[in-house]
């Protein structure tokens, strides 16, 4: 006889863990719940519905995951945590999905799509603070590009790829 591995999700336990985490944070701190990869196999939509109105953002890995949440009626902002090819910007704007912006060219393309759809496309600046993985470098050229981006009709928030602790 063969046995399948199965993950049983206790939504009461998930809610308890969420509440404990939220209670430890200052009120002014925003909470982003990462539910990429179908919440690591636990069900992104059920967890998103459970935390709806209490989580400040949901983080996902790709456009398909973000659209799934939006089509399920999730109103909490959804942020894709990695780069999104420009060919998906139409859906990004259509479904009001937030994306990280890594350069001026992408910001201009996203802004143009938002203008085309007569909508605002919120995005997050991605600043590289030491890992040299993703984001604007901390230098004058990047500062100038970020300043130019702020003149586009679609600005929202800031996030970073922090340095690891040594």
What are these regions, as identified by a protein language model?
Residues 22-27:
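Glycine-rich phosphate/diphosphate-binding loops that line cofactor/substrate pockets in enzymes
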Residues 1-2:
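Gly-rich Lys/Arg/Thr-decorated short loops/hinges at beta-loop-alpha junctions or inter-strand turns
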Residues 5-8, 13-16, 29-158:
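Active-site-proximal beta-alpha core segment in soluble small-molecule metabolic enzymes
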Residues 159-166:
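Conserved small/polar residues in nucleotide/adenosyl-binding loops
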